[in-house]
Amino acid sequence: MLGSRLTFCYGFLHLLLQTHVLVCAYPNSDAVVRDTDTLKTLLQRLEEAYLLTVRAESLERGQVADGMPEEQSYEAEDGSQERLAEESAIGYITLDAEEARLPDRNSNGFLNPLRNTKRYSGCFGRRLDRIGSMSALGCNGGSRLSYKRS
């Protein structure tokens, strides 16, 4: 009789420990929802604070902000190179400054390197010329892998 009660107590204790482990592994969903809501509001506050500091820095440098006229634009300033150096040091560049550094996509200078990647010697044709240049066959002469003896 005492043995059955003892095994029942051990079994019940084991069951309680297993439920405790499961409760700890999967916390209450209400607490998780509250934590995610708190994190979302904290993230929104952080984004707002960051935007305010960026706007304050841009106003200090005289850049265009929301509601400022175009005459006070930073493009009218003479120190555009200094501004680019400052912005790259800070870690962000305005879209206009990034577009100014890129070449014009419609000009021929932009597409020429892409078009001239395959050289055409005229011996066999474009495909065979490409194969021939790799295997030292064709009109190009020796291979780039062969060693010149002098």
From Swiss-Prot:
Disulfide bonds: C123-C139
Tissue: Atrium and ventricle, and to a lessex extent in brain.
GO molecular function terms noted in the UniProt entry: hormone activity; hormone receptor binding
InterPro entries to which the protein is assigned, alphabetical: Natr_peptide, Natr_peptide_CS, Natriuretic_peptide, Natriuretic_peptide_atrial
Biased segments, Acidic residues type: 68-79
Positions of region (Disordered): 62-83
Location(s), subcellular: Secreted
Domain of life the protein comes from: Eukaryota
Keyword field: Disulfide bond, Hormone, Secreted, Signal, Vasoactive
Entry's Gene Ontology cellular component terms: cytoplasm; extracellular space
Keyword Disulfide bond found: yes
Family, per entry: Belongs to the natriuretic peptide family.
Protein name per its UniProtKB record: Brain natriuretic peptide
Lineage start: Eukaryota, Metazoa, Chordata, Craniata, Vertebrata
Originating gene: nppb
